[in-house]
């Protein structure tokens, strides 16, 4: 039986931050061009893993699918916390 009282360490394959940033910028721009609420669509994708939240236009869907959702979330949280310090 596992002990759920211990904190597990999370690790993932390191992807350059600029790659994550450029993909998110392209996805955001594409969603806005299509008239969607970009933040809601990205959150929907991150929570569900369903690529249908992201359009195929500008290769946005293909690009975001090549980055693990965990990596995207780590980058978003990291940047949010950096910004909130200022």
From Swiss-Prot:
Please, which domain of life does this record's source organism belong to? Bacteria
Alphabetical list of InterPro entries matching this protein = IreB
Q: Which family does it belong to?
A: Belongs to the UPF0297 family.
Please give the name of this protein: UPF0297 protein SERP1181
User: Could you tell me which species this protein originates from?
Assistant: Staphylococcus epidermidis (strain ATCC 35984 / DSM 28319 / BCRC 17069 / CCUG 31568 / BM 3577 / RP62A)
